[in-house]
């Protein structure tokens, strides 16, 4: 009798919510030349194919920096850099095109494999490349002519979406044509970032040399807001060797992730190309493995003060009257106002949530979550949740829980799962209202 491991079954079951959540979503993946040259590249390709088979719409952007350098070295040639951007003259352009063309064919061939006894057995992927991106020259900066180094002029999002809807993987490289028929060398990080923004992608994913953004203790930072990511960028720009792969690839992608999030891409992920299965672990497991930069809002998110009491009452009173929220008096709000986080727009409070920590149990309750009816079509509930998670982690909280009668599905979509009354902190358990019969859901941090 064969001994069967339950680990596979358990992992497969736990991934189901993420499979459902990602199905039909558009994700832009950046594979730098360093990732393609790594021994783990074939596993990355297998994981991208798996994502596609699970219904994810994939745009794959590749770079060619080390491959270009290798070809230049063979010819005993070098290209100058200006502000960390390669100056691509007429002589080096042919080498850049050669490297990019070889990688395009190699990636397409890898995605086309469907041999038996391989992870891609039975897959039949269509890979589409073309002039989806139109370029223009960077021009002259501080007296330096970038020649055939360029930037994006426009992106044919309609054509890309049409290819994605037909089930194809769209493959984009660092070479793009201009309206004059010339070729230009683009930064792959810029291509990935701008494509994600223009497509209004759900995720931007970058394979980098590190596991993500690494803190001073050597651990990957799981989640960053754009403002926090910018602080890391400033620090790393000073501390890191400007000629290193981290500076040229990871740091540049992190800047792109910040730009993408601020332009409306909900999440950008940094994962290591050296770790087998990093892509699957990041997207289809609860804990993830890398760093994600999550969307911040142009609206102000801040801790509430006493002057906000009237606005909070105006926001939550209709929900209290409907029985969705537990009624709070003005006096109670005045006493607890420091526990509230609000979203403010043009002087109007359009969202709020409160955090009640139970330090001894390392738990915290997220309560009184409310969004103004005119602003419920965005991601403001998720924005408040992200702030609550960030705030909870800073004070050593390991689990957030909520009591809800009407929003069970929304919280479950965010990774919460149902727990019993006995799992509540002792002080909260004694206050549980059995007549209201609120569902209790928890989210480990």
Swiss-Prot record:
Keywords: Acyltransferase, Amino-acid biosynthesis, Arginine biosynthesis, Cytoplasm, Transferase. The keyword Cytoplasm applies. GO terms for molecular function: L-glutamate N-acetyltransferase activity. SUPFAM superfamilies: Acyl-CoA N-acyltransferases (Nat) (SSF55729), Carbamate kinase-like (SSF53633). It is found in: Cytoplasm. It is an enzyme of class 2 (transferase). Residues 299-438 form the N-acetyltransferase domain. It catalyses: L-glutamate + acetyl-CoA = N-acetyl-L-glutamate + CoA + H(+). One of its GO terms (cellular component) is cytoplasm. The keyword Chloroplast does not apply. InterPro entries: AceGlu_kinase-like_sf (IPR036393), Acyl_CoA_acyltransferase (IPR016181), Asp/Glu/Uridylate_kinase (IPR001048), GNAT_dom (IPR000182), NAGS_kin (IPR033719), NH2A_AcTrfase (IPR010167). Its EC number is 2.3.1.1. GO terms for biological process: L-arginine biosynthetic process. Pathway: Amino-acid biosynthesis; L-arginine biosynthesis; N(2)-acetyl-L-ornithine from L-glutamate: step 1/4. Pfam families: AA_kinase (PF00696), Acetyltransf_1 (PF00583). Belongs to the acetyltransferase family. ArgA subfamily. PANTHER family: AMINO-ACID ACETYLTRANSFERASE, AMINO-ACID ACETYLTRANSFERASE NAGS1, CHLOROPLASTIC-RELATED. This is Amino-acid acetyltransferase. It comes from Vibrio vulnificus (strain CMCP6). The lineage of its organism: Bacteria, Pseudomonadati, Pseudomonadota, Gammaproteobacteria, Vibrionales. The gene is argA.
């Amino acid at each position: 009798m064969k001994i069967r491991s339950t680990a596979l079954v358990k992992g497969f079951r736990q991934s189901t919510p993420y499979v459902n959540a990602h199905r039909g979503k558009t994700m832009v993946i950046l594979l730098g030349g360093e990732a393609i040259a790594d021994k783990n590249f074939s596993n990355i390709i297998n994981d991208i194919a798996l994502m596609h088979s699970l219904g994810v719409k994939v745009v794959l952007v590749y770079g060619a920096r080390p491959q270009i350098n290798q070809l230049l070295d063979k010819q005993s040639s070098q290209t100058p850099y200006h502000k960390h951007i390669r100056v691509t003259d007429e002589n080096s352009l042919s080498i850049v095109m050669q490297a990019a063309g070889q990688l395009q064919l190699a990636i397409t061939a890898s995605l086309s494999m469907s041999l038996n006894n391989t992870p891609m057995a039975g897959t039949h992927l269509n890979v589409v490349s073309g002039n989806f991106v139109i370029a223009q020259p960077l021009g002259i900066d501080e007296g330096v002519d970038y020649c055939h180094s360029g930037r994006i002029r426009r992106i044919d999002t309609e054509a890309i979406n049409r290819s994605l809807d037909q089930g194809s993987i769209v493959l984009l490289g660092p070479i793009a044509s201009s309206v004059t028929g010339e070729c230009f060398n683009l930064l792959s990080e810029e291509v990935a970032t701008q494509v994600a923004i223009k497509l209004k992608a759900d995720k931007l994913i970058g394979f980098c040399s590190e596991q993500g953004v690494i803190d001073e203790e050597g651990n990957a930072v799981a989640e960053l807001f754009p403002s926090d990511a910018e602080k890391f960028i400033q620090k790393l720009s000073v501390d890191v060797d400007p000629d290193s792969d981290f500076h040229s690839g990871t740091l540049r992608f992190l800047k792109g992730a910040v730009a993408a999030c601020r332009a409306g891409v909900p999440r950008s992920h940094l994962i290591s190309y050296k770790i087998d299965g990093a892509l699957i672990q990041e997207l289809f497991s609860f804990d993830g493995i890398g760093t994600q930069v999550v969307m911040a809002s142009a609206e102000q998110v801040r801790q509430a003060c006493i002057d906000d009491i009237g606005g909070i009452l105006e926001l939550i009173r209709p929900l209290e009257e409907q029985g969705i929220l537990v009624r709070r008096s003005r006096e109670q709000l005045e006493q607890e106002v420091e526990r509230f986080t609000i979203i403010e727009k043009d002087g109007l409070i359009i969202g709020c949530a409160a955090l009640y920590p139970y330090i001894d149990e390392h738990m915290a309750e997220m309560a009184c979550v409310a969004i103004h009816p005119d602003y419920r079509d965005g991601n403001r509930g998720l924005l408040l949740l992200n702030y609550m998670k960030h705030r909870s982690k800073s004070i050593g909280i390991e689990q957030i829980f909520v009591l809800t009668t009407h929003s069970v599905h929304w919280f479950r979509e965010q990774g919460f799962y149902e727990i019993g009354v006995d799992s509540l902190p002792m002080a909260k358990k004694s206050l549980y209202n059995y007549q209201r019969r609120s569902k209790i859901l928890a989210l480990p941090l």
